[in-house]
A protein has these predicted regions:
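Conserved beta-strand/loop scaffold segments within soluble protein domains that form the structured core
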Residues: 1-149, 163, 170, 174-192
């Protein structure tokens, strides 16, 4: 009853990585937040597949994952994110949202985002999902460069900003700082 779960996931390497978190609410009043960041390079495949099962009343869940991908055409960087949220018939008062955003940095990258939401009752507070897969925004890049910021630094700033929504929600400062450092290391590969 009234349990709180904060799950943080970060993937920055590995040829094939699969992470499969599961949340199963068994008593009312639970609150779960699942946060994730990933940065895939050539030849890497990352899969995040989660299930949030709302089976009791008055629980809340929020899922937010963000990833960036850069790869070569011959050796793609690939990611797959599947977010399953189930709101069962006796889970009145549920409030849930899931989001996955992917930033494609090169032509040799592919991201699949599959949010699934199954609702068996109409008596909920809220439920929704969103997923995006998009290329780097040249308009933002142009704006920063018009302000005198060199192109490589402007790219790094935009990508850091993309991940900040997740990183700033992590309450453990040492963990959020480590993630910022790992992202900086990945960004150095881009400008190299």
């Amino acid at each position: 009853r009234d349990a709180v779960l904060r799950h943080n996931s970060a993937i920055f390497g590995g040829e094939v990585v699969r992470i499969v978190p599961r949340v199963n609410f068994t008593a009312p009043g639970g609150d779960a937040e699942l946060l994730g960041v990933y940065f895939a390079d050539s030849g890497q495949y990352f899969e995040n597949r989660m299930l949030v099962d709302h089976s009791v009343p008055n629980c809340r869940s929020n899922v937010l994952y963000k990833g960036a991908l850069q790869g070569e055409k011959k050796n793609e960087a690939r990611t797959c994110w599947v977010g399953d949220v189930l709101i069962r018939s006796n889970a009145q008062g549920t409030d849930t949202y899931e989001t996955n955003n992917n930033l494609i940095l090169t032509d040799g990258a592919r991201a699949d985002a599959i949010p699934n939401l199954e609702i068996e009752t109409g008596e909920i507070t809220g439920a929704g999902h969103a997923a995006t897969v998009g290329r780097f925004d040249d308009i933002e890049l142009f704006y920063l460069m018009s302000r005198g910021i060199p192109e490589a630094e402007a790219r790094r700033l935009i990508i850091r900003g993309f991940f900040n929504e997740v990183i700033h929600r992590i309450p453990v400062q040492s963990l959020s700082e480590e993630l910022e450092n790992r992202i900086s290391e990945e960004l150095e590969k881009i400008s190299a």
